């Protein structure tokens, strides 16, 4: 009986070739594992970056921009602000989309001061961000008589500063500028068109507990507590602290050769008072 040996396949690899092939496979597997790990780490990095950004915006400070002239001359259309979120504590309106992380009231609450320029959700729908000055505190009575502000039946003194032409969303208007002194001594400027506008004569309004009366410094071009009433403390989002950027809207930031034309450089990094 004849003996036959199993023939070696013609395409069989030599031991050296097999070793090289295995090294290539191992190297490929290692590269794929490394790329998968880097991809996962990349997504983790993005996730934690987003979380950190949301935490900063919710708990520390948040940028806002001014779309209307209701706070002229203090804030101008095109101003960009840093608003600190910790001054008054936190409520659901401190968080993006007003998520009910804090379902009721505020935590770590510190009462605002009269004269603060605050950002809040406009009642009663509590959806739109407004920025106004805090004029009335809890327990105060507020009234406008003939264009003059009365707090607790005492007229708030104001000093004439002059007249100025100002371009607003309503066109060019001649404003009278006054310096107003609030009962706590805070001094700020206001604009008036006339003392005979819609909100220049109002009934007395008593401010409930944990609520505040908000008014724009542009007294005849501001939708504020004279229209929608006192603002609950829970609606407060933060205190306006600093203007970090300001533009008149007639150019783009990358047009550096035109910066002097449309950037209000003198307003950069100025405190809000």
Indicate where each model-derived feature is located.
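Aromatic-capped interface at the extracytoplasmic side
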Residues: 57-71
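Soluble "head" domains of membrane/secretory-pathway proteins
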Residues: 2-43, 64, 73-273
